[in-house]
């Protein structure tokens, strides 16, 4: 069975995603399942976020999920090796909400991206939702910096995991149909049409945007 890359647009721990999660876990059997806490590792309530996610998977999906602590760019040593050991034995890896640029800052130039690819190459499942999903492409939307801090739109280099796993030069944008802004356009992960159009012109010619709507998912069989 090939590996499976799952990209969720939002709602990763909502009732709407219970059935998809159960279906995905059927591929994994009783092999280990690991939640990666990096994207929200900067938040003071990170432990609570992890606990709620673990409870969701146990109570709603019926699966035990362990947490791999990788909240900073772990220096070589016991803590990093312990986290990597968990990742390397997992058949299901999940990362979700938080800040994509924070996650990238602590994943780049570490063995973690290779561990994600290894999971896919071992017929495992990698599930990336919301902020974590933004890191998967060749370029990443720095959503907090643009939407919250008012920085001029720019692209952050992504992990390029989609290209490395299946050859597609994709730029992943979750929350694609977001409507929280009401009359203000917050589609395309809060960028709006105008900003996304301008940013697309800065992408390499071969790149394309893979948009995933909220409470929807994209499955890429590796």
Residue ranges and their predicted role:
Residues 96, 104-186:
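Class I SAM-dependent methyltransferase SAM-binding "motif I" and its flanking Rossmann-like core
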Residues 168, 173-203, 212-214:
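A conserved mid-domain beta-alpha-beta active-site/ligand-binding segment of alpha/beta enzyme cores
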Residues 1-96:
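N-terminal beta1-alpha1 cap of cysteine-dependent amidohydrolase-like domains
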Residues 33, 93, 130, 172, ...:
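A residue-level signal for conserved active-site and pocket-lining positions in enzyme catalytic cores
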Residues 9-11, 36-39, 97-98, 131, ...:
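Active-site-proximal beta-strand/loop segments in catalytic clefts of secreted hydrolases
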Residues 13-14, 100-101, 133-135, 216-218:
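Glycine-rich nucleotide phosphate-binding loop and flanking beta-alpha elements
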Residues 220-222:
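Conserved small/polar residues in nucleotide/adenosyl-binding loops
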């Amino acid at each position: 069975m090939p590996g499976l890359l799952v990209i969720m647009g939002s709602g990763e721990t909502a009732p709407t995603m219970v059935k998809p999660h159960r279906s995905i876990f059927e591929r994994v059997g009783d092999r280990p399942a690991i939640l990666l806490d990096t994207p929200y590792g900067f938040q003071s309530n990170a432990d609570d976020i992890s606990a709620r996610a673990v409870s969701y998977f146990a109570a709603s999906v019926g699966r035990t999920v362990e947490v791999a602590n990788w909240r900073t760019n772990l220096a070589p040593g016991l803590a990093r090796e312990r986290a990597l050991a968990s990742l390397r034995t997992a058949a299901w890896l999940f990362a979700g909400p938080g800040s994509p640029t924070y996650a990238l800052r602590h994943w780049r130039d570490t063995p973690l991206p290779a561990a994600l690819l290894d999971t896919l190459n071992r017929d495992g499942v990698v599930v990336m939702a919301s902020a974590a999903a933004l890191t998967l492409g060749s370029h990443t939307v720095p959503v907090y910096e643009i939407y919250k801090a008012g920085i001029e739109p720019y692209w952050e280099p992504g992990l390029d995991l989609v290209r490395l796993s299946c050859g597609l030069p994709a730029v992943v944008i979750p929350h694609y149909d977001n409507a929280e802004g009401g009359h203000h356009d917050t589609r395309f992960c809060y960028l709006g049409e105008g900003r996304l159009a301008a940013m697309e012109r800065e992408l390499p010619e071969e790149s394309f945007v893979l948009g995933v709507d909220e409470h929807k998912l994209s499955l890429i069989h590796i």
